[in-house]
Regions:
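N-terminal prepro-regions of secreted/extracellular proteins
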Residues: 8, 29-30
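Short, surface-exposed ligand-recognition loops at beta-strand->loop->(often short) alpha-helix junctions
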Residues: 46-55
Length: 145
């Protein structure tokens, strides 16, 4: 009977430690992101589009945030296919990431009122993106470092 009692106490102890350790597990929900956050756009080049046109849109996109005093980075990438250790020479897709310093800054930006000039400037770079690319993927991202 004493052995059964000790086994029961041991089982309760291990269960308690297991429950408490799970309680302190870090959350990886987007709303708990502690690093920089971003909007990721993956695009395909239109037949009539050019990398030069895409780069022009990226430049205006960056200027849009800078002109409004925001510390936001617009990063653009050209993706290339890989075949084993070799990289193909032709662009595969284009990627744009709009990086905000924090979730709080992104939220403040998203909840602000757009002026007529804001909308005009926004439409200007979006039109250039749309003339050169088609967005196929939209994601929100959290940088862990």
């Amino acid at each position: 009977m004493k052995t059964l009692k000790y086994l029961f106490l041991l089982l309760i102890t291990f269960t308690s430690f297991s429950v408490f350790s799970a309680h302190h597990e870090k959350s990886y929900n987007f709303s708990d992101c502690e690093g920089e956050v971003g909007n990721l756009y993956v695009s395909e080049m239109l037949e009539s589009g050019t990398v030069k046109g895409f780069k022009k849109a990226v430049k205006l996109h960056q200027k849009f945030y800078k002109d409004r005093g925001l510390d936001v980075q617009v990063k653009a990438n050209i993706e290339y296919e890989r075949d084993g250790n070799e990289t193909t020479d032709q662009p595969s897709r284009l990627t744009t990431v709009v990086v905000f310093p924090s979730l709080k800054v992104q939220g403040l930006w998203q909840n602000r009122e757009f002026t007529e000039q804001d909308q005009k400037d926004f439409n200007a770079f979006v039109e250039i993106y749309n003339a050169n690319t088609k967005v196929t993927v939209r994601k929100s991202i959290c940088y862990l470092n």
